[in-house]
């Protein structure tokens, strides 16, 4: 909607970490707006439940990448270099495709309530509600797999189920017996960091240094940093989250062997700065750094201690020995 920041007042936004929902309440021109935002724990899907008499539309804007070292990665000035279109549509859903250069990805959007969908620009899609209360879900996919129709309440329920299990199954810090006046704030920050790391650093590849919040190092990740982001999962009793990422090492094993061979070594030399493909990023020094080398040994050992069985040894033996 075409609203200036000055029109938005009385902002009250709370992250409920136990249920995985953000509760937002604010006013636009003095009229109240409430929004519940959740993320599906098993799919690349976000949901929003909106209630306001203003019937505010929601816009989906798609940027071109900046290619910069560190920024939000969004270039809004190159509209002609990419295109967004509606691939298919149903009674309460659409499938959008966004194509930039040789890359295409898809966004499945579903909604509940009386809503008008429309393309409002070359790279902008809008949902305009006709009722005070409505909701929508949006799911990212690298392929057109069809619309997965999940309503917002289902997403919020799945998020609540996941986070309830997360907090009950793992460890947390408790500084309630500490006499230092800083203890309560330190405990809050440590627990919040557990949530943030689980949200941003437990994917199918090692995370970039800024997680998902910001774009750093051209969006690439650095293997020397995976220990800092993910070792704590196993120590807090969430070894399953660490186990999500480590299979990536196996997928790039042939490339790591090539690096070692090129440099005159046996075994593997893990890439320092890379991306999901495992290809080394250009660098004057990166290829010769070794601080990323021992991490797979340490992290595999953490998984073995959490699950002391032959399956873990068999899964990671080659990577550990070749490292």
Task: Say what each PLM segment does.
Residues 1-220, 239, 249-257:
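Acidic/polar, glycine-enriched structural segments that form the non-catalytic walls/loops
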């Amino acid at each position: 909607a075409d609203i200036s920041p000055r029109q938005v007042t009385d902002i009250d936004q709370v992250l409920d970490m136990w249920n995985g929902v953000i509760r937002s309440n604010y006013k636009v021109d003095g009229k109240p707006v409430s929004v519940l935002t959740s993320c599906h724990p098993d799919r690349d899907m976000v949901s929003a439940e909106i209630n306001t008499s203003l019937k505010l539309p929601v816009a989906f804007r798609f940027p071109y990448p900046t290619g910069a070292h560190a920024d939000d990665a969004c270039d809004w000035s190159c509209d002609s270099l990419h295109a967004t279109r509606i691939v298919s549509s149903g009674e309460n859903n659409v499938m959008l495709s966004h194509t930039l250069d040789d890359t295409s990805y898809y966004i499945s959007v579903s909604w509940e309530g009386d809503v008008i969908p429309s393309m409002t620009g070359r790279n902008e899609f809008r949902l305009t509600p006709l009722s005070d209360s409505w909701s929508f879900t949006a799911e990212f996919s690298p392929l057109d797999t069809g619309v997965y129709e999940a309503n917002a309440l289902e997403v919020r329920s799945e998020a609540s189920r996941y986070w309830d299990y997360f907090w009950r199954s793992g460890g947390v810090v408790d500084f309630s017996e500490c006499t230092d006046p800083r203890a309560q704030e330190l405990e809050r920050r440590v627990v919040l960091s557990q949530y943030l790391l689980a949200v941003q650093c437990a994917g199918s590849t090692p995370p970039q240094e800024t997680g998902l919040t910001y774009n750093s190092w051209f969006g690439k990740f650095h293997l020397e940093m995976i220990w800092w982001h993910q070792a704590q999962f196993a120590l807090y009793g969430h070894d399953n989250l660490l186990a999500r990422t480590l299979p990536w090492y196996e997928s790039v094993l042939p490339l790591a062997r090539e690096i070692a061979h090129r440099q005159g070594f046996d075994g593997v030399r893990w890439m320092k700065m890379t991306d999901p493909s495992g290809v080394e990023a250009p660098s004057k020094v990166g290829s010769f750094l070794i601080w990323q080398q021992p991490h797979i040994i340490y992290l595999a050992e953490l998984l073995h201690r959490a699950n002391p069985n032959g399956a873990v040894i068999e899964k990671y033996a080659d990577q550990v020995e070749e490292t």
